Amino acid sequence: MNREFVEYLSERTKHTLAVATILHTQGSTPRKAGTSMIVHPDGSIFGTIGGGRAENEIRLSAVDSLSKKETHRRIQVILDDDVAVKEGMVCGGQMDVWIETQNV
């Protein structure tokens, strides 16, 4: 976790948000394990874990997790399907992502 990330969290009080962190990658991916981003219930984010369709899929999953009041969720994002190729995201890898709800 970098300094900006910690400062961002410390400036928020009485907020519920999700932290999405890449646990593991396989093949070519835009970001590697350990990269995190914050997702708010309204879908706004702080940070990035790769951009594009993959990041949007993770963002939507985090918003869903928050709305269901889950404590955590693990998802896998595959970056080599037809949609990814059409959007120019031809990394060809996959990311395992941990989404954890935080009350700060």
Give the ranges of each region predicted by the language model.
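Segments forming oxygen-rich coordination pockets for charged ligands
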Residues: 1-104
